[in-house]
Amino acid sequence: MPPTTPERGRTLTGVALMLGAMALLPFLDVVAKHLGQRGLPVMQAVWARMAFGALLTLPFVLRIGGAAALVPDRPVYHLFRAGFLIAATFSFFWSLKYLPIADALAIFFVQPLIVTALSPLVLGEHVGPRRWAAVAAGFLGTLVIIRPGFQTVSPGMVLALMAGLSLALYMLMTRRISGRSHAMVTTFHTSLLGAGIATLAVWPVWQAPEPVEWGLFLLLGVIATGGHFLIVRAYDHCEASLLAPLAYTEMVMATVAGWWFFGDFPDGWTFVGVGILIASAVYISIRERKAGAETPRDFEQP
């Protein structure tokens, strides 16, 4: 085999970091589902995700930009972004009360297709007929997973779709400010403002957590921050269009984690629908790569 060139080495490192992040992030859902089974309100898990996420990213932000980086440059804009991220996180965590992790994630994967469909309206981007066809195929994949008319559409399916839509709107807002500041700084601002919103929302339903639940709250923040850090580092080594399809490898660990911790396993039709979604997303990524389009480096996982 030919020796590894520096550029090829960077690409392989970026791919490895992205795959590592996708192997780690499903455990965020495992912890959230476990907290729900312990009877804690969903909003408390959302609050922990935001509050501990802000706390754990704080040292990185201080290292990147010092104390000046703690103040958002566009606070109202970041506040709306935080609101969409909270809506996505809340809807997804709530969907885990009704669905296995892999099923909820499969429906949630409609998010990049929604971004593509709405980008002409929100961002004025051009989407050609081939990418529209890929979006339509992805929507068909979502219908295969949900199968309306062939099975009862559970509240969890609706919540997972709402999570995908909310995160799509969050990502569209992220694209508008992409490149203005470091991704970690932007993420910190979103988590900080999100923690403020979540604090107000969780106050009326707050239940005193037990010590083990405080530990799970911290674990939510550690997993989310660790996964995000790996993704940021991956984007430092590879272009976005190469890494974007790798996000779908998260389904592998989500399936394993759901089976191991909760005894859940998706049915065959779910895998068929996920296959259609992945094919659609990979095609869209290839088209964007050929067009020279970059997806935003800022990334969030509900």
Tell me what each language-model feature is.
Residues M22-F27, A51, L58, A82-F90, ...:
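Hydrophobic/small/kink-forming positions within alpha-helical transmembrane segments
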Residues F92-W94, P112-A133, V205, V252-F271:
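C-terminal transmembrane-helix exit sites in multi-pass transporters
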Residues R130-I146, W269-E288:
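Hydrophobic transmembrane alpha-helices of multi-pass small-molecule transport proteins
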Residues T13-A21, V61-S91, P155-A163, A208-G226, ...:
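Loop-to-transmembrane-helix transition segments
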Residues L105-V110, I177-L192, H228-W260:
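Helix-helix packing/entry segments at the starts of transmembrane helices
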